[in-house]
């Protein structure tokens, strides 16, 4: 009996897992450096600007970048974390310091992982930039998934649609109508092109305050946007899969960049499936900001806002107060939540 042929995605996943295992095996001694007190300097404040498998790059108050080990007692360290660290009196195996503690986070972005439970991505974020693209098509369902995460994390969101240069006149009108759905409920939107430069000045101005993070599926052009905003970084850009239209992951670790006009930008690895399995039904419902005015006014207290009689949300949809596409996506999220909850269980992130 012949073996089943693996898809390109399956082959890449196997290769990636194999590479990670080899990396951990070859470098495990590096993470086991036994830093004694007499080998370290004074305690200092710093910010994590890059996170690797067993190390992190920390920026001190003078702007110097130091590669550090992590104390085994630390549960998680992510880009954007404000940490307490100590510099080694000498460099050991390419490492110059150790992170001793993580300051309390103002907020964090997490995503569920099938094997590791909830996995933090970044911390202390002022703004989430949801990057989508007009090709292969503009997915409002994926945008809504990201918005639920933004609302549950209490982090402001901006919707950015890239590759506007590929739009015909008719398609541009259609995308404009789709974005109007979000503008009506208070979200800022931008239709841009990293290739032609359309509206890139507006995006750059938006990033000039606080710390922003780009999130979005692979292939939407996050790396191309970073190349435009920070040409000196020369982030690697990936080629779209001819089969699926989804791009291969081109960023291997989360990084924080300082922008010349002010502000910081975090780029994180692409996420093809941004799961919401760690959220319950109530959290997803609260993730739809236009629902808030009507919640608590349904006929029945346990209304699920699906096919229940006397549902105030359904009535608002019929009266044009809630967009039907958003309500349809809500149905999809709740259905997928019910299906996944029966299969998976996720632990809390710390």
Curated annotation (Swiss-Prot):
Class of the enzyme per the UniProt entry, highest EC level: hydrolase
UniProt-listed CDD domains: YjeQ_EngC (cd01854)
Domain CP-type G: 106-274
Main location, first listed in the record: cytoplasm
Compartment list: Cytoplasm
Cofactor: Zn(2+)
Function in brief: One of several proteins that assist in the late maturation steps of the functional core of the 30S ribosomal subunit. Helps release RbfA from mature subunits. May play a role in the assembly of ribosomal proteins into the subunit. Circularly permuted GTPase that catalyzes slow GTP hydrolysis, GTPase activity is stimulated by the 30S ribosomal subunit.
Annotated protein name in UniProt: Small ribosomal subunit biogenesis GTPase RsgA
Organism, as annotated: Histophilus somni (strain 2336)
Upper lineage: Bacteria, Pseudomonadati, Pseudomonadota, Gammaproteobacteria, Pasteurellales
Originating gene: rsgA
């Amino acid at each position: 009996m012949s073996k089943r042929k693996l898809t390109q995605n399956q082959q890449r996943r196997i290769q990636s897992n194999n590479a990670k295992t080899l990396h951990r095996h070859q470098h495990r001694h590096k993470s086991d450096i036994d830093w004694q007190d007499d080998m370290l300097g004074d305690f200092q404040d710093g910010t994590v600007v890059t996170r690797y498998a067993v190390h992190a790059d920390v920026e001190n108050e003078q702007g110097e970048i130091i590669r550090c080990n992590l104390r085994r007692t630390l549960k998680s360290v992510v880009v954007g974390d404000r940490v307490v660290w100590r510099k080694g009196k000498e460099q050991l195996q390419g490492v110059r310091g150790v992170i001793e503690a993580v300051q309390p986070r103002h907020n964090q972005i997490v995503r569920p992982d099938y094997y590791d439970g909830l996995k933090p991505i970044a911390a202390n974020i002022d703004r989430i930039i949801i990057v989508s693209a007009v090709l292969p098509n503009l997915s409002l369902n994926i945008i809504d998934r990201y918005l639920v995460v933004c609302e549950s994390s209490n982090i402001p969101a901006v919707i950015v649609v890239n590759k506007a240069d590929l739009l015909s006149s008719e398609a541009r009108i259609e995308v404009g109508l789709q974005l109007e759905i979000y503008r009506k409920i208070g979200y800022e939107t931008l239709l841009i092109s990293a290739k032609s430069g359309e509206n890139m000045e507006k995006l750059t101005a938006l990033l000039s305050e606080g710390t922003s993070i780009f999130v979005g599926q692979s292939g939407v052009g996050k790396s191309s946007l970073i190349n435009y905003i920070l040409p000196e970084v020369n982030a690697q850009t990936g080629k779209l899969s001819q089969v699926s239209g989804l791009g291969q992951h081109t960023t291997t670790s989360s990084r924080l960049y300082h922008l010349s006009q002010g502000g910081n930008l975090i780029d994180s690895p692409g996420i093809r499936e941004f799961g919401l399995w760690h959220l319950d039904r109530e959290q997803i419902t609260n993730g739809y900001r236009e629902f808030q005015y009507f919640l608590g006014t349904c006929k029945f207290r346990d209304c699920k806002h699906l096919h229940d009689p006397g549902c105030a949300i359904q009535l608002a949809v019929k009266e044009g107060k809630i967009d039907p596409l958003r309500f349809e996506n809500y149905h999809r999220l709740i259905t997928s939540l019910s299906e996944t909850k029966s299969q998976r269980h996720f632990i809390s992130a710390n």
